[in-house]
Amino acid sequence: ERVCCGYPMSCKSRACKPSYCC
């Protein structure tokens, strides 16, 4: 599963903008 780069959350989290995913 991809993560929200720079943030301790998953890319699926509403708080993570798609552009932050890696």
UniProtKB/Swiss-Prot annotation:
<keyword id="KW-0800">Toxin</keyword>
<dbReference type="GO" id="GO:0005576">
    <property type="term" value="C:extracellular region"/>
</dbReference>
<feature type="disulfide bond">
    <location>
        <begin position="11"/>
        <end position="22"/>
    </location>
</feature>
<feature type="disulfide bond">
    <location>
        <begin position="5"/>
        <end position="21"/>
    </location>
</feature>
<feature type="modified residue" description="4-hydroxyproline">
    <location>
        <position position="8"/>
    </location>
</feature>
<keyword id="KW-0872">Ion channel impairing toxin</keyword>
<keyword id="KW-0379">Hydroxylation</keyword>
<keyword id="KW-0738">Voltage-gated sodium channel impairing toxin</keyword>
<dbReference type="GO" id="GO:0019871">
    <property type="term" value="F:sodium channel inhibitor activity"/>
</dbReference>
<comment type="function">
    <text>Mu-conotoxins block voltage-gated sodium channels (Nav). Intraperitoneal injection into fish (1 nmol) provokes weakening and difficulty in swimming after 20 minutes.</text>
</comment>
<feature type="modified residue" description="Cysteine amide">
    <location>
        <position position="22"/>
    </location>
</feature>
<keyword id="KW-1015">Disulfide bond</keyword>
<keyword id="KW-0027">Amidation</keyword>
<feature type="disulfide bond">
    <location>
        <begin position="4"/>
        <end position="16"/>
    </location>
</feature>
<dbReference type="InterPro" id="IPR008036">
    <property type="entry name" value="Conotoxin_mu-typ"/>
</dbReference>
<keyword id="KW-0964">Secreted</keyword>
<comment type="similarity">
    <text>Belongs to the conotoxin M superfamily.</text>
</comment>
<feature type="modified residue" description="4-hydroxyproline">
    <location>
        <position position="18"/>
    </location>
</feature>
<dbReference type="GO" id="GO:0090729">
    <property type="term" value="F:toxin activity"/>
</dbReference>
<keyword id="KW-0528">Neurotoxin</keyword>
<dbReference type="Pfam" id="PF05374">
    <property type="entry name" value="Mu-conotoxin"/>
</dbReference>
<protein>
    <recommendedName>
        <fullName>Mu-conotoxin-like pr3b</fullName>
    </recommendedName>
</protein>
